[in-house]
């Protein structure tokens, strides 16, 4: 009941210094898109339109719990939280060379800011609503509605963390 799966990515899309990331909660999907209409790599070198990329939990782990009370304990978890960090920002990479960094990663897996480290947990706050959320950047970048990347930070080098859990991992699974 305390296992998490995490998909971490440093999704350098073309020129790494002009990226945005986001999450689609309903699709359990994390994505990267360009912060500028043109990109030095795709437009300048290949003469191509700027692409986007995505990460999906095609099928999350069996939760081995009956969360909705229907008697079925083999339901599957989707993305249960999404976090991000921007290089050089206040929300940046956890410390990779210390135990403190492990506690920071645990916070990210549970959908909280990495610092201060666990057991202290500070939630992400959606600037468009003022509400706490476990899904950072879950707005719609096409319409500009909700919390989208670019509101708090300019385009830049991003990392994203998609999580699913907690769930029970049975022996032999």
How does the language model describe each region?
Residues 1-173:
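Extracellular/surface-associated beta-sandwich interaction domains
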């Amino acid at each position: 009941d305390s296992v998490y799966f995490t998909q971490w990515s440093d999704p350098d899309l073309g020129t790494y210094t002009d990226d945005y990331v986001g999450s689609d909660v309903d699709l359990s999907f994390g994505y990267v898109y360009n912060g500028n209409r043109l990109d030095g790599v795709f437009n300048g070198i290949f003469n191509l339109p700027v692409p986007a990329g995505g990460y999906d939990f095609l099928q999350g782990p069996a939760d081995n719990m009956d969360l909705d009370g229907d008697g079925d304990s083999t339901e599957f978890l989707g993305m249960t939280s999404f976090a991000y960090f921007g290089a050089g920002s206040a929300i940046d990479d956890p410390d990779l060379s210390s135990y403190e960094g492990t506690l920071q990663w645990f916070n990210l897996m549970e959908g909280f800011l990495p610092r201060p480290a666990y057991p202290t947990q500070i939630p992400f706050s959606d600037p468009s609503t003022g509400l706490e959320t476990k899904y950072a950047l879950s707005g719609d970048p096409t319409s500009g509605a909700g919390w989208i990347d670019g509101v708090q930070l300019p385009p830049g080098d991003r990392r994203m963390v998609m999580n699913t859990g907690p769930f029970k991992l049975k022996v032999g699974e």
